[in-house]
Amino acid sequence: MLRRMNTFSGQKLAAVVKELENFAPTSWAEKWDNVGLLIEPHREKQIKKILLTNDLTEPVVKEALEKEAELIISYHPPIFKPLTRITQSHWKERVVAACLANDIALYSPHTAWDKKSGGVNDWLSKAVNIISIRPLEPELGAPPGTGSGRYIETKMELSQVVESLQKRIRNSVHVALAVGHTPKTLIQSVGICAGSGASLLKGIQADLIITGEMSHHEVLEFTHNNTTVLLCNHSNSERGFLHEFCPILAKSLNEECLVFVSEVDKDPLVTVASDINKELSAFVDVYKSTSK
């Protein structure tokens, strides 16, 4: 039987933050990042309901209010550049104002979760049959497996990776074929970076790279260096980890808090096909043209 929401005793905000730090210390985050507790309510209260989201948009704030969440954990920090004012003229300012007005705490882990062993990049890596895996840039002084990006040794046909990745992110994937690659190309090395990974992945020797987004010219640079590129859209390469983290956090809090994933958080980009049959066969058609 499902536990009734009003039976959760909750924990103090400081205790929840401590568990979040235990999972992935904010000291692991990139120096440019803005992570940790970003909004602390003026009035202390028990944290009974925790909403997880990839991006804190206005629809997500509305959802948090409707579901009476006392804490929002937003993977991307909504407060990144310093705010010079909090008015109703910009959506990010309205988001912050709503949290302050309703005593909702806000925490963001961002790149600390990326580096975590068992974090965002490892979640995305599970789309590949892993023979071996290591960080592209290990985090000094951290446990083994901690660091930026992932480099994987595998043995899979390219078409198999594409199909597996689509199932992993539960969405479509953009494919940029390397010159000379076909659907039957055996992929033996993969570079992975959730989010926007071009700068980290640049220069690595891999048959394939998987990331969320990169520019047109960055894609061309990879494909002309014999590396196929798979793009998931930025947040689609990250969001699925929230469902893995949800029970982890609940357990670490002794099941005293209700932890749930936003139902309205989604990537702003969607693929609209003018002809669904053409869309479904596009992947095969591209390969046919390259194999002639």
Swiss-Prot record:
Annotated InterPro entries: DUF34/NIF3, DUF34/NIF3_sf
GO molecular function annotation: identical protein binding
Family matches, as Pfam families: DUF34_NIF3
A single Gene Ontology CC term: mitochondrion
Family matches, as SUPFAM superfamilies: NIF3 (NGG1p interacting factor 3)-like (SSF102705)
Family named by the database record: Belongs to the GTP cyclohydrolase I type 2/NIF3 family.
Protein name from the UniProt record: NIF3-like protein 1
